[in-house]
Amino acid sequence: MKYLIVIGSGLTDRPIAEKDNRTPLEIADTPHLDQLAQKSLCGNVQTIPENFEAGNDVSLLSLLGYSPETHHGGTAPFDAVALDVPLAEDDLPLCCTFVQLQSSHNDMVMKDFTADNLPSEESRVLLDALQEQIGDPSVRFYPGRGPHNLMVIKSPAFSNTLNPPMELIGEGIRQFMPEGDEFKELVFLMNQSQIILHNHPYNRNRQKAGQDTVNSVWLWGNGRRQTLPPFSETFNKSAALVTSSLIFKGMGKSAGMDVVDIMGPNGNPASSFKGKVAAALKELDTYDTVYLHIEEIENISLKGDLDDKVLAIEDFDQEIAGPLLNALNCRDDVKMLFVENHVSSASLMKYTRDRVPFLVFPAQTGSQSAEGFDEKIVDSNKTHFKSGPQLIEAFLKDQL
């Protein structure tokens, strides 16, 4: 038997009052997801353990089958693994994300954590300017994906975890800036980056075109470095991972998985859902277990655009769920687990720790199905798992 694990980030949400207390997933037309739910065992899972904040660093690790309580590390260390950046003992990796800030009274407000979906090529131009003007043997910059890059500094580990920018839309940043002597150099580097970016020809051209400038970096993602136990030894199955997410790629490589790097136009994460589906189905010919991760809807959710989220979910249904349903209907040697890693709420513009729905296709005789794939699965008395690792173990051991 082959095992396909599909993680759809950003699908579920909280009920929205102005939408008759429906969620975007309930509003969207999703015939293929609903058909899957009707033919599957449906249940829910708590991917975020107690005492952990919701985020990809926790939920994706959980759905790889590794307990965050034991194996949690920072986003930046996994990004460094993904980018093959060597780290010395005294190196501290940090996520270095280009953002757009907006002046507001005596503060700056986070306007866009993707810097207007900054393409990788343009991000590289700005990153090169930072490396040239403030880089030295103790401060190094490495290009990543789109606005998301990596900075490595010579420093002891920080005592506090830095705030990620994804949940700060509309927030004044002053309250989230790190304080204390250990962060003085970090704040200095952020301030220097703003000066360099303000004077960069790229931003002058954006100003002339009436566009918001890419006027700051946001430094975050510090945490412990982790080497994960090999997936093949943990579950006695070979595995591949299809993703355009740096952190998930880093986790997969740390776990000894074969990582298929799917890129789209201009070096951005692939806009073509179909390319990811085709890659995952191809990997099933070689590997026992294949992970397929679709992350595009998450950023739309965190920007708070409900209508765009509904449209993105409908695209997901047509270009991910539909082709997968058609492909698996023609095979009897593949089981699929479809699950979300955590709630990315468009109404709150935040991650939440809410339980998320899952389905296992095809269902065994007598399994609990559902009329549609939405949040009602979470509220029903269907199969529940207390953690992601418990769900993954049960799925891979044919207990579902």
Spans of model-derived segments:
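Feature captures the catalytic ectodomains and active-site-proximal regions of enzymes
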Residues: 1-400
